[in-house]
């Protein structure tokens, strides 16, 4: 579910006006629980890098801070086309700020919901943020897993989904 959000902040999407996050820098577009940082210099981490594919030096880059969009991934070409400052062309190592609960704690806190364990295809409209995904997992009732579910569709809008993020696991 994070992939369409990242795709929406690429310079090419912004330049082509094909993004549901167009003109949203420094605006609240997600829940306070959403803090996402690009950490390209994590020691011994897969994907760590000091330069992006264009040779631009990487640095720690806040992407979302408490639901506020802080940056786009602007490559050299897009920066020149839009007259914007380049950042880096693509994410390195994205880290989300941990919440306080483990998976069992998250499940126990839900009266009625669904634990999604897999996706069975689907799509997201990059301009509007509307999505539809096939999901499978387990029904949660009164804080406990009650029965498996499959062949179910989850539909909605990315801005609404991320604005309603209630918890992040640890």
State the predicted function of each range:
Residues 1-21:
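Active-site pocket-lining segments that scaffold enzyme catalytic pockets across diverse folds
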């Amino acid at each position: 579910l994070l992939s369409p959000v990242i795709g929406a902040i690429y310079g090419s999407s912004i330049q082509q006006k094909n993004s549901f996050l167009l003109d949203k820098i420094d605006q609240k577009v997600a829940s306070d629980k959403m803090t996402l940082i690009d950490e390209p210099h994590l020691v011994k981490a897969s994907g760590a890098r000091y330069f992006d594919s264009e040779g631009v030096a990487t640095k720690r880059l806040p992407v979302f801070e408490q639901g506020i969009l802080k940056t786009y991934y602007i490559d050299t070409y897009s920066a020149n086309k839009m007259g914007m400052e380049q950042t880096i062309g693509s994410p390195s190592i994205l880290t989300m700020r941990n919440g306080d609960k483990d998976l069992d704690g998250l499940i126990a806190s839900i009266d009625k919901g669904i634990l999604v364990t897999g996706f069975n295809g689907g799509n997201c409209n990059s301009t509007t943020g509307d999505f539809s995904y096939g999901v499978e997992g387990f029904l949660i009732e009164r804080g406990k897993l009650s029965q498996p579910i499959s062949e179910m569709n989850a539909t909605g809008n990315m801005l609404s989904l991320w604005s309603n993020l209630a918890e992040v696991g640890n």
